[in-house]
């Protein structure tokens, strides 16, 4: 690297000293004066998604956007991130603009509802003011806004049905993100904005889908996750979950456009054991021979559901497999978890009764 001459260095030092006097210590600095460490992240609770994000989860101090069609799992992902943060002693704020949070479902996903800070604002302005106050406190580790589409401007609420309010919500979001972005970074908070899809009228080529709230969130978000339900998971005639795919559409902290696939089981959330089996097979840590799954000398079971059930009943084996996968991708090791087997689960599910993924549209 070239060396800056003495006169330039003196001028820079003088300018920096003047800036610090005017704006305070820390307002300007040399990047090399501070330890550059790997970016801190909060796990998503899904091994495959942590790998796809490149840093082991969602980055701290950044804005995250999760969007997709209805009932695709957007809130489930946000609640899993909240639960993972709480496990590490983090505080979570939840702006429930849709007024639709189910506390019992959140509890099943591992969220400590007693310590969850929740607000159900009357207007979009109120919701974003509360969000800013929580972030500015410096005590919130994860803030979830559910959803951007439900942040209705005050003028629209007080107006008549049928009144035109073009661009009001976009202006509201643009102003809010300008104010929030710097504070979120300084307080090392993860701000998750859940968003809905709309369709643009008259689009002939390309996707007509767009997200609500204008373009500001697309620019300010460091990570954008497109979540889709791709299949139904059946046991007999009953649908017991969804097969879900997430595509990382934007990523400022790692290479984008990676994908993750996993099961979201009803009343359970993301199937951690199912994810370990899938990624383990892909990475050849778990061996699959016909319908049988094995890990070294340990036979996990015949059929994917038996393998999942074995890992639920033997969390030490699941942890060992997961940490081998994490080591391969330079991710921090996982801690021991205990997941009880589902109520009424048979000790050995035959391969014939294995849960099937319905590929019909």
From Swiss-Prot:
User: Which stretches of sequence are listed as region Disordered?
Assistant: 342-361
Annotated Basic and acidic residues bias: 344-361
Q: Which GO terms describe its biological process?
A: DNA recombination; DNA repair; SOS response
What SMART domains does the annotation carry?
AAA
Please give the Gene Ontology molecular function terms for this protein: ATP binding; ATP hydrolysis activity; ATP-dependent DNA damage sensor activity; damaged DNA binding; single-stranded DNA binding
Cellular localization per UniProt:
Cytoplasm
Q: Which cellular component appears as one GO term in the record? A: cytosol
Keyword presence, Glycoprotein? no
Keyword terms of this UniProt record: ATP-binding, Cytoplasm, DNA damage, DNA recombination, DNA repair, DNA-binding, Nucleotide-binding, SOS response
PROSITE patterns referenced in this protein's UniProt entry, alphabetically: RECA_1, RECA_2, RECA_3
Which Gene3D superfamilies does its entry note? P-loop containing nucleotide triphosphate hydrolases
**Taxonomically, which superkingdom?**
Bacteria
* Residues involved in ATP binding: 68-75
Q: Which PANTHER family match?
A: MITOCHONDRIAL DNA REPAIR PROTEIN RECA HOMOLOG-RELATED, RECA
Q: Which family does it belong to?
A: Belongs to the RecA family.
Function as written in the Swiss-Prot or TrEMBL entry = Can catalyze the hydrolysis of ATP in the presence of single-stranded DNA, the ATP-dependent uptake of single-stranded DNA by duplex DNA, and the ATP-dependent hybridization of homologous single-stranded DNAs. It interacts with LexA causing its activation and leading to its autocatalytic cleavage.
Protein name per the record: Protein RecA
Give the source species. Clostridium beijerinckii (strain ATCC 51743 / NCIMB 8052)
The upper taxonomy is: Bacteria, Bacillati, Bacillota, Clostridia, Eubacteriales
Designated gene of the protein: recA
């Amino acid at each position: 690297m070239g060396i800056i001459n003495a006169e330039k260095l003196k001028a820079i030092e003088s300018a920096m000293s003047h800036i610090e006097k005017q704006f305070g210590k820390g307002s300007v600095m040399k990047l090399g004066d501070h330890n550059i460490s790997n970016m801190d992240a909060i796990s998503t609770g899904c091994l495959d998604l942590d790998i796809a994000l490149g840093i082991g989860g969602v980055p701290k101090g950044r804005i995250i956007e999760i969007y997709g069609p209805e009932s695709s799992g957007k809130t489930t992902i946000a609640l899993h991130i909240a639960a993972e943060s709480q496990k590490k002693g983090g505080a979570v704020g939840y702006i429930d603009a849709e007024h639709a949070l189910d506390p019992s479902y959140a509890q099943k996903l591992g969220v400590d509802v007693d310590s969850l800070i929740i607000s159900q604002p009357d207007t979009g302005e109120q919701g974003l003011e509360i969000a800013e106050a929580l972030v500015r406190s410096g005590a919130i580790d994860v803030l979830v806004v559910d959803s951007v589409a439900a942040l209705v401007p005050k003028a629209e609420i007080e107006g008549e049905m049928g009144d035109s309010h073009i661009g009001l919500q976009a202006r509201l979001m643009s102003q809010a993100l300008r104010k929030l972005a710097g504070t979120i970074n300084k307080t090392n908070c993860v701000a998750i904005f859940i968003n809905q899809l709309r369709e643009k009228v008259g689009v002939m080529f390309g996707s007509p889908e767009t997200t609500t709230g204008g373009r500001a969130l697309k620019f300010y978000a460091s990570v954008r996750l497109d979540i889709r339900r791709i299949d139904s998971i059946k046991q007999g005639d009953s649908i017991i979950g969804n097969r879900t795919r997430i595509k990382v559409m934007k990523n400022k902290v790692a290479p984008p456009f990676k994908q993750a696939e996993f099961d979201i089981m009803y009343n359970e959330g993301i199937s951690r054991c199912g994810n370990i089996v899938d990624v383990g097979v892909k990475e050849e840590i778990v061996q699959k021979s016909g319908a049988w799954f094995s890990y070294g000398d340990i036979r996990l079971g015949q059929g994917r559901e038996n393998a999942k059930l074995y890992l639920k009943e033997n969390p030490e084996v699941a942890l060992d497999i997961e940490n081998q996968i994490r080591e391969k991708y330079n991710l921090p090791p996982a801690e021991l978890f205990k997941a009880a087997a589902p109520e009424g689960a048979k000790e050995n599910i035959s391969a014939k009764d294995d849960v099937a993924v319905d590929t019909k549209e």
